[in-house]
A protein has these predicted regions:
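Receiver (REC) domain active-site loop signature in two-component systems and cognate sites
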Residues: 65
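Acidic, metal-coordinating helix/loop segments flanking the phosphotransfer/catalytic sites
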Residues: 40-58
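Conserved acidic carboxylate
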Residues: 19
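Charged docking surfaces used in two-component/phosphorelay signaling
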Residues: 23-33
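C-terminal output helix
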Residues: 116-126
């Protein structure tokens, strides 16, 4: 609706991005924060801790991260109260067929390999969050 006031940040859908490459994390945060609340974690352990305090509407996880990897973080986050069905997008350099199968079997809606087109990622986010 044209002319309607902007949605206050606190009412926006929350995306938790777990990415250990600071350049990619900043780029995703910059682009997605125009429409969503974005929280960035630099590893899987941090992502699980953030999700427990601020439950996300969408997880965007790198698979290869130090400490707790994205697959493990996704499993742990989905064990948290109310997050069993939180949608997941994996963003990763792991592009082998078995890697993709593991990602999809872990419940991911999308498995996007790096390098990726930012427009494609944004389109997938919008489709999942219906905005």
């Amino acid at each position: 609706v044209s002319g309607s006031p902007p949605t206050p940040p606190s009412a926006r859908r929350h995306i938790l991005v777990a990415e250990d490459d600071p350049d990619i994390a900043r780029m995703l945060e910059r682009v997605l924060s125009a429409e969503y609340r974005v929280t960035v974690a630099s590893n899987g352990f941090e992502a699980v801790a953030i999700a427990a305090k601020k439950p996300p509407n969408l997880l965007m996880l790198d698979i290869m991260m130090p400490g707790v990897d994205g697959l493990t973080a996704a499993r742990q986050i989905r064990e948290l109260p109310g997050l069993k069905n939180v949608p997941i997008i994996f963003l990763t350099a792991k592009d082998g067929p078995l890697d993709v199968i593991k990602g999809i079997q872990s419940g991911a809606r999308h498995y996007i390999t790096k390098p990726f087109k930012l427009d494609d990622v944004v389109a997938k986010v919008k489709k999942i969050l219906k905005t």
